[in-house]
UniProtKB/Swiss-Prot annotation:
Gene Ontology BP annotations: tRNA modification
Organism lineage string: Bacteria, Pseudomonadati, Pseudomonadota, Betaproteobacteria, Burkholderiales
Source taxon at top rank: Bacteria
Keyword ATP-binding annotated: yes
Interaction with substrate tRNA, as annotated region: 36-39, 160-164, 244-249
Positions annotated to bind ATP: 11-18
This protein's name: tRNA dimethylallyltransferase
Keyword set, alphabetical order: ATP-binding, Magnesium, Nucleotide-binding, Transferase, tRNA processing
Recorded catalytic activity of this chain's protein: adenosine(37) in tRNA + dimethylallyl diphosphate = N(6)-dimethylallyladenosine(37) in tRNA + diphosphate
EC number: 2.5.1.75
Amino acid sequence: MTPRAIICLAGPTAAGKSASTLALAQRWPLEIINVDSATIYRGMDIGTAKPSAAERAQVPQHLLDIRDPAQSYSAAEFRADALRLIAEIHARGRIPLLAGGTMLYYKALREGLDDLPQADPALRAELEARAARLGWPALHAELALLDPATAARLSPNDSQRIQRALEICRLAGQPMSALLQGERRGDAPSPYRYVTLSLEPSERAALHARIAQRFDAMLAAGLVEEVRGLHARPDLHPGLPSVRCVGYRQMWSYLDGDIDLDTAREQGVAATRQLAKRQLTWLRAQPERVIIDCLAGDAVARTVDAMARALPD
C-alpha cells in the first residue's frame, strides 16, 4: 500500500511561506502544522514573523504559542506532536500542511531521532557559567579535544551547538560524532510519504535584500521593545533557546550594552542570512523536492499549482 502523502511547504527565511500558506488555505480545507522553533514561544511575535490574529482566523494553525520563553521544546516533542496532529486532522476530514523553516524538525519527523542523551539543566547551567567567564571560543577549544569531528564543523561562537556537544560528551561518555554514526533509536517508522514544496531563490542577492528589508520592518514594528520586555524578566538569559533565536540574541546584546543598535541590526541581518544558507543547504538534499522560485512574481500561483499536483486524487 502506498503511504499517504504529506505536503511540506518549506524554504529559507523571507521566502514568502506565509503568503503561500494563506493562498493554499483558500483552495483546500487545510490545517497548518507550524514547523518553526521560534514561533512556539509566547510573547515573541515580531521577531519571529508569527502569523497575525487575522491570518490565524483564515486557517487553523497548530504549534504556535505553546511554550513560555523560559521553557524548551525538543525535536522529539515536535515529532510526537506533529504525528498526533496529522492523525487528528485527517480524522476531521481535512488536509494537514507542514509549513516552516526549522529543518531539524523536518528531519526528526521524516527519519526519527538519534539515541542521544536528554538535556541536563544543571549541566547546561554549568557550561553557560563557564562560557560567561571564558567565552564560547574557549569551550569550542575544549570540544576540539573531546570531539574533533564535531568541533571542526562548528563556529567557535556557535554557543547552542557547542553546549549541546559538550553536554553529550559528559553525559554519554563518548563524542557526539561517534553516537551519530551508531544505530538510530527505535522510533516507529513514519507511516507517511513527505513531499516538499521548496520555496527557493533564483538569485541569492535578492533574497539577502529581502532579509534586510524584513529585519528593518521588524525594527520599525517594535522588535527592540518586544525584546526589552523579555530582557526585563529575571528568569530569562542568553543561554535559553528562545533568547538565542535570530534577532533576539542580537537585540539582547544591545540591551545588555555590549553593542550599539546599528551593530545589533547588522549582526541580526548577517545571522538571518546565515540561517537562510543553512536552510537551503538542507533543502537541496531532500528527495521529492518540488522547487518553486520564491522571487517570481507568480510564486504564490506556482505554489498552488504544485500543491494540486502533489496531492493525491
